[in-house]
A protein has these predicted regions:
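Acidic, metal-coordinating catalytic segment for phosphate/diphosphate chemistry
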Residues: 3-38
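Active-site donor-binding loop signature of nucleotide-sugar glycosyltransferases
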Residues: 24, 52, 65, 113, ...
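Short glycine/serine/proline-enriched coil/turn segments at secondary-structure junctions
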Residues: 30-31, 57, 102-104
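Conserved beta-strand and immediately adjacent loop positions that scaffold enzyme active sites
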Residues: 38, 46, 129
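Conserved hydrophobic "DFG−1" position in protein kinase catalytic cores
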Residues: 41-42, 49, 113, 132
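Conserved Nudix-box catalytic region and its N-terminal flanking loop in Nudix hydrolases
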Residues: 42-84
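Unchanged
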Residues: 68-153, 159-161
Length: 161
């Protein structure tokens, strides 16, 4: 079982963007589901990852990702987030999977995206760094589900080839 931190309402404070947040860990608490788009971006024999500058998991690494804005097409949101966070222009190629966890209001939609332009650079205040890592030599990942997502992606590579 996954240990889910579920703060009680009295433990909430106003977060950096005005939304309620856990006073212990800083995680934003949403009252309704929020859609997050993420990208696995193959590049130079590895995948692009960002080092988080915000909670949860400051200093740990994950995929370029972000919230989908109201009225925004999901694929466009993923392409926007990769550009904002990594300086890379990408085209979303295919769906890797949909992910959700009990006790978490986030619905995570992960795509594979192909680099079409730009320059790899940390271009966003939400990240400390951006790098390409070999699948066999990953840094400390921000979220438990990241390894499962990578496994799903690698498994899907076998069916595409």
């Amino acid at each position: 079982l996954i240990d889910v931190h579920e703060p009680d309402l009295p433990d909430l404070k106003r977060g950096p963007h005005g939304h309620p947040a856990c006073s212990d860990c800083g995680r934003t608490i949403w009252n309704d589901p929020k859609v997050v788009g993420a990208a696995i971006v193959p590049m130079d024999g590895g995948i692009v990852m960002v080092q988080r500058a915000i909670e949860p998991a400051i200093g740990k690494w994950s995929f370029p990702s972000g919230y989908v804005n109201r009225g925004e097409k999901l694929e466009n949101a993923v392409e926007r987030e990769v550009l904002e966070e990594c300086g890379l222009e990408v085209d979303v190629e295919r769906l890797v999977g949909l992910y959700s966890e009990e006790g978490n209001s986030i619905i995570l939609v992960v795509y594979e995206a192909r680099v079409t332009g730009g320059k790899l650079e940390s271009a966003d205040h939400e990240n400390l760094d951006v790098r390409v890592f070999s699948i066999d030599d990953l840094p400390e990942l921000a979220f438990e589900h990241d390894r499962g997502i990578l496994a799903d992606w690698m498994k899907s590579q076998e069916t595409v080839l």
